[in-house]
Amino acid sequence: MSQEFAHLSVLLKETVDGLNIQPDGIYIDGTFGRGGHSRHVLSHLGPNGRLIAIDRDPQAIEAAKQFADDPRFQIVHGGFGQLADYVAELGLVGKIDGVLLDLGVSSPQLDDAERGFSFLRDGPLDMRMDNSQGQTAAQWIARAEIEDMAWVFKTYGEEKNSRHIARCIAADREKTPFLRTKDLADLIARITKNKERNKHPATRVFQAIRIYINSELEQIDQALEGAVNVLAPHGRMSIISFHSLEDRMVKRFMRRHSQGESVPHGLPITEAEINKSKKLKTLGKAMKPSEIEVEQNPRARSSVLRVAERLDY
């Protein structure tokens, strides 16, 4: 693997430590990427341990060949949103000792201009996590209504100028279709008046399109629900998020499953019944990378790790 596309796993020790790995346990790395977290998990497993990795990126599946000779490891080509389905097919529901999710786009995906994720590198406007299927960002931009684009930019990118940007994209695509990342990034930079300090004007729009194209938030929601339902009693989940939308989802999910389902005041429901709906115990506070890690890997700056443990059934 070239140095250009090398990937430094974020919060590596903290994330794997959060799983409290047992030598004979069964674990899931739902976001294999280039295998950094998987390698660390395998180093903690004994000969009877097992690691099931998942990724929908064909390049990640190719990278997984590095573990082809390790009988403890297997890779599944698919989205982590279907995690529970894969576990059910293997007959392992309720037997998983830990689930690891490193959300968002990986460094190799960002650094490879041909994947179309980066506004800093000119390449085809693609953005698909699985570039073997589904519509590209260019195809969506060519067809999307102004209102739909504005909604995506605001909802998934928290972009304040969403409507203005959507209108400008619609006007420009009538003359020339947006086929390259540079074309879209340059337009947004040109029409943005109040630029954020130390942030490219296209950051939020590119994030929004990527999340929408890949149904990322839906995948996260399905993965979290799936993980809590396949974990063994006292099994752990270590979840790394990189932006406020992701972290908000993870935080709310863990809070809901650790506090139990909320019920309207006055209903004749006992404390014991509420406790039955509690599935998780959150462990410690959210963790951020150290200053040293951020110096070594600036992309780790916004990462947040949350860990929870499955309660007894």
Swiss-Prot record:
This is Ribosomal RNA small subunit methyltransferase H. S-adenosyl-L-methionine binds at residues 35-37, 55, 80, 102, 109. It comes from Shewanella denitrificans (strain OS217 / ATCC BAA-1090 / DSM 15013). Its EC number is 2.1.1.199. Belongs to the methyltransferase superfamily. RsmH family. GO terms for cellular component: cytoplasm. GO terms for biological process: rRNA base methylation. It comes from the Bacteria. NCBIfam families: 16S rRNA (cytosine(1402)-N(4))-methyltransferase RsmH. It catalyses: cytidine(1402) in 16S rRNA + S-adenosyl-L-methionine = N(4)-methylcytidine(1402) in 16S rRNA + S-adenosyl-L-homocysteine + H(+). It is found in: Cytoplasm. SUPFAM superfamilies: Putative methyltransferase TM0872, insert domain (SSF81799), S-adenosyl-L-methionine-dependent methyltransferases (SSF53335). The keyword rRNA processing applies. Specifically methylates the N4 position of cytidine in position 1402 (C1402) of 16S rRNA. Keywords: Cytoplasm, Methyltransferase, rRNA processing, S-adenosyl-L-methionine, Transferase. GO terms for molecular function: rRNA (cytosine-N4-)-methyltransferase activity.
